[in-house]
Structures are given as C-alpha cells and as structure tokens.
UniProtKB/Swiss-Prot annotation:
One GO location term (cellular component): cytosolic large ribosomal subunit
Any one Gene Ontology BP term: translation
Annotated keywords: Ribonucleoprotein, Ribosomal protein, RNA-binding, rRNA-binding
PROSITE patterns: RIBOSOMAL_L22 (PS00464)
Molecular function as annotated in GO: rRNA binding; structural constituent of ribosome
Protein's UniProt name: Large ribosomal subunit protein uL22
Pfam families for this protein: Ribosomal_L22
Superkingdom of origin: Bacteria
Family, as annotated: Belongs to the universal ribosomal protein uL22 family.
Entry function: This protein binds specifically to 23S rRNA; its binding is stimulated by other ribosomal proteins, e.g. L4, L17, and L20. It is important during the early stages of 50S assembly. It makes multiple contacts with different domains of the 23S rRNA in the assembled 50S subunit and ribosome.
Amino acid sequence: MRAEYKNMKSSVQKVNLVADMIRGKGVDVARSQLLFLKKALAKPLSKVLMSSVANAQNNFGVDPDNLYVKEVFVGKGMSLKRFAARARGRSASIRKHYSNVSILLGVLDGSKG
C-alpha cells in the first residue's frame, strides 16, 4: 500500500517540513491537515496520499477508514544545473533540486488509534 512521486520540484528539506506533519496520523486526519495547510507542497503530497489510499482500496480491498500513514520517505531526486551570468564575464552555477516522495500506509489494529 504505497504510492510514489518521483522528481517533485522542491528540495528535500522543504518537503520534509510538510511530511513531518502527516507521519503516524490516520488518513483522514492527514488529508485534512494537508487540505488546510498554506504551503504549495501540501497539494502534491495530498495527491500522493490519496493515490496510496486508492491503491490500498483497489489492490488489497482495505477499508480506507482503517488506514494510517505508516511511513513517508523523502529522498533526493535529480538536480538540474543551470548557469547565471555574473560580473566581468563570469558565470555562477545554480542547482535546481528535486525530491522523491514515497508514502507507505498501514492498517490500524484494535490497539492502535
């Protein structure tokens, strides 16, 4: 019960700020937090979360009410190298960072909640 988003246009540190908010929470709580969060990364992470819920529902037949966010992996993706003009005919390199995100869901037991 996993979904991935490869090469999200943001750095790992920025994605981790949002990912820390949903780790270990129920799917409905995590989705509502992402829905009302005023960060640009909340929308793509919400889509990945709902994709993993759909994978759990369609592939494993699990009830979405019994799911929680077990793990959120945020890793370094590709980085584009660009160059900007500087004074005296020089140039400076600019790196545009990307991230890979993977959300793993677990099934709630009676003891967990």
